[in-house]
Amino acid sequence: MKSFKKVAIIIFTLTFGLSIFSCKENKSTMLNQNKPLIFYNRQPSDPVTGKLDFSAVSWNSRTYYLGTDSQNGGETQGQMILDFLQNSNGEEIDRNGDGIIGYVLLIGDEGHTDSKARTEGVRKALDTWNNSTKPNIKKEGTVNVGGKTYKTVELAAKSMTGADGSTWNAAAARESMKIWTNSFGKSIDLVISNNDEMALACIASENFPKGLPVFGFDANASVEKAITSGLMTGTVTQNTDSQALALLFLVRNMCDGFLDSAVYTQGFSHGDKYGNKISTPFVYYNDSRSLLVSNTAINKDNWNEYMQNAHNSQISKVQSSRVKLLLSVYNSNNDFLNQNFIPSINYYAPLLNIDVTIIYGDGQNESSCLSKFTNLDYYDAYAINLVKTNNAHLYTNKLNEK
């Protein structure tokens, strides 16, 4: 997101007009191509270069991308690791006493915006960044551990792709960690993963060294025991509950007829007419039509603060007309979406009077979602979680059909 112009969400906004195409007023006549469309979690982009697919996010005036600030996420994970090292005893971290902090890096998906940002953030923090997120392009660096300078070496990095072609694959992570443990032994001082699921797979791998610091990303419910017991050192929350609420607010606002900046400020920077307001700050990037939430580092000391009673109890029931939303989930086995995001969607949707129909994919083939992306006239809005980030046009093409 570096090149995109940032537009801060401010308390007061000048535009509060109603659209003549509000969902409420035109359910029977509105063309699907004019309805609200939100891409979320997986930004439409080139999977190789990461370049934004602007034609997708600007498909109509009611199209947006909702997600986390990827760059901030990578920086947050990197800083979390630095903070841990600076407050640790170097002799305890450097397991073989060679003066080198060696680490292995589990990459989720080389072409995914979030994965690339996390890889970059970690390498920059550990001074191994060599202007690339590719697995084998890095350099040696230095880092402060407990007041002493140590050399840093990325012993191995690998994109975790399963035999079936699925990315962010836990089975691949488990097998890779087993191989690395056998190959590098006590040279491994840290395990760093682009997500929690792969981090947990490493901990469960054969002969995994007890007490080895492990860092993940997502703060899934499945890592609670690992975090609170110290098996896992740290993770990063994408403030998922707020993301889910934000998606529903975007839908609600557009279907209630709000235009322009009112779409992403009503309920965000200020409360709606019921006093409902998201507690987490969001930033809107005008050049990419993206609404992004910041990230927070999590360890055993602050897990309860961020994860217990995660739902916003201040959100009250609205009296607006009922809205029907079709929402896709790219992978029915994805922990982040199924443990965190979807439960929040299911919690808030009734409060905002939104009926949500969820379709699930297999994480590999776009057709697994696209084949269920049907009966489109029935719905007032759509939320798409792409299987492949360069396939947004397949959905907009269907919405364009007469």
For the regions a protein language model found, what residue spans apply to each?
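Bacterial N-terminal signal peptides that target proteins for export
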Residues: M1-A8
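C-terminal motif of bacterial Sec signal peptides marking the signal peptidase cleavage site
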Residues: S19-S22
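Flexible loop/hinge segments that line or gate small-molecule binding clefts
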Residues: N26, M30-N72, E91-G102, N220-T228, ...
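Hydrophobic alpha-helical
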Residues: K27-Q33, L37, V122, N144-K225, ...
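Extracytoplasmic "Venus flytrap"
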Residues: S28-T29, I107-K116, L190-D196, V323-S344, ...
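Hydrophobic alpha-helical segments within soluble ligand-binding/sensing domains
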Residues: S58, Y64-D98, A117, A170-R174, ...
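Short, solvent-exposed amphipathic alpha-helices that sit
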Residues: G73-Q77, D114-V153, A172, S176, ...
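Hinge/cleft segment of the Venus flytrap/periplasmic-binding protein
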Residues: G97-G102, L106-E110, D114, L126, ...
